[in-house]
Amino acid sequence: VEETPVGSITNGVHGATWVSAEVDGVLSSTVGDDWQWADHDAWQAITHVDGDALWQAHAASKVRMVDHVRDRLRHHGLAQGRSASELEWVDTALDPSALTICFARRMATYKRAALLLSQPERLRALLGDDDRPIQFIFAGKAHPADDHGKELIRQIVTFSHDPAVRHRFVFVEDYDMALA
């Protein structure tokens, strides 16, 4: 251990790929334009980050994400033969100011994607609470040979089609890096 020190394990995450353009701007102005490669000492500048600027970057990223998800929902609805009037709800789906929980990954049973659905009435109550708005965005694919993973997706999609919750509980098809 002393001979091979390990500073961190990232599981292959490449920060510059996944950080939004807005947050990238804050990091560049705080840590430096090369924040992706900055050393520990350079990262100490993050303790002086402008909290308002960081929050504004987060909020702008979230608005962009909501717009992108709405576009995806509309596109897939039209591709499935739904009319524009049937998809009017998409214009108000998701609220950029609500607590947003995203689950976007490979759908496998051990990841417990459908755990929320084990108490559907409780989930409906949470989704309907306008005083404490919360919303969920699901996306992902199952391995072609994983029937259980496909069943998880079916359960999530079925719940997301409920008109009472579809504005706060969505499944986005064709998960890819653009959506991620």
Language-model features, listed with the residues they occupy:
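Catalytic cores of carbohydrate-active enzymes across secretory and cytosolic contexts
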Residues: 1-180
